[in-house]
């Protein structure tokens, strides 16, 4: 499929539900690349795109049957906070930060909210 790094931003429905990233990752089960790319905002360029371990910044709600649903607003806000240094910052190339910010920010704009700026 596509290359690694930031996953192209897309518009989707959004949700204000409480966020549980671990549960949503678990619900993905053994999903393949096309499903994983719908749930996350970044993929390791050297990783296996068919494994969850190659992905970061999950922000979509995932049903128990593995269906990727709306982008979760809290997850998008948290992801941008990590890009800006929260929880030790993001362990991704500096050149990928803007693309991930754009992806997460688009979902927040879909929800009618303005994302925090990306800090240098």
What are these language model-derived features?
Residues 1-120:
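Extended terminal accessory/targeting regions
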């Amino acid at each position: 499929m596509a290359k690694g790094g930031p996953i192209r931003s897309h518009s989707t429905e959004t949700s204000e539900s409480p966020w549980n990233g671990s549960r949503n990752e678990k619900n993905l089960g053994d999903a393949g690349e096309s499903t994983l790319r719908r749930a996350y905002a970044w993929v390791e360029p050297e990783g296996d795109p068919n494994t969850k371990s190659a992905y970061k910044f999950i922000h979509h709600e995932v049903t128990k049957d593995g269906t990727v649903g709306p982008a979760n607003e809290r997850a998008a806000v948290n992801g941008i906070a990590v890009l800006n240094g929260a929880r030790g910052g993001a362990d991704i190339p500096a050149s990928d930060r803007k693309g991930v910010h754009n992806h997460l920010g688009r979902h927040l704009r879909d929800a009618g909210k303005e994302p925090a700026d990306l800090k240098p």
